[in-house]
A protein has these predicted regions:
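Conserved "boundary/linchpin" sites in short secondary-structure elements
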Residues: 1-30, 51-54, 78-90, 99-113, ...
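Soluble non-cytosolic domains of exported or imported proteins
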Residues: 4, 8, 33, 37-44, ...
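Surface-exposed patches in mature extracellular/periplasmic domains of secreted proteins
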Residues: 58-63, 117
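Short, small/polar residue-rich loop motifs at catalytic or cofactor-binding pockets
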Residues: 67-71
Length: 142
């Protein structure tokens, strides 16, 4: 009898753990050199939009003070195109540029919803890119 109760308790715990596990979002991490075809067009469209908005909103203070540099940024995009998070992985060394990159992501959002072929196994797409604020006052992403 005691053994049956213990087995039932363990089965209930396993079910609870499994349910919790199923609720964890499936994340896919993509860098600049991704080889998977199904991500290529989405990433390219994302890059074009970010650079267009970034160049329209290039930080005036950086331009005025002639501050240039590179930083690495990760942007987590939900399936509906909204931004879950933005994180500076490697700073440019200039607070102005790091803050500008995060601001540009917020201005650019929302992004296009993830296409069905990506959504089939991805709930959150994390795009990591190097952003360069150039001496010609342009934003480039690689």
């Amino acid at each position: 009898m005691q053994r049956s109760l213990e087995i039932a308790r363990l089965e209930a715990q396993i079910d609870k753990n499994w349910d919790a596990y199923q609720k964890i979002p499936r994340r896919k991490f993509i860098g600049a050199r991704t080889q998977e075809y199904r991500f290529a067009q989405y990433i390219e469209d994302w890059r074009i939009k970010v650079e267009r908005i970034g160049n329209l909103n290039y930080p005036d203070e950086a331009r005025r003070l002639q501050i240039y540099g590179k930083l690495q940024l990760s942007v987590a995009i939900r399936a509906d195109g909204s931004v879950e998070s933005v994180e500076v992985n490697r700073s440019s060394g200039h607070r102005i540029l790091d803050a500008a990159a995060m601001r540009i992501v917020r201005l650019t959002a929302p992004f296009s919803p993830l296409p069905p072929d990506i959504r089939k196994d991805t709930d959150i797409l994390v795009i990591t890119r190097t952003w360069t604020f150039t001496s010609s006052d342009k934003l480039e992403s690689e």
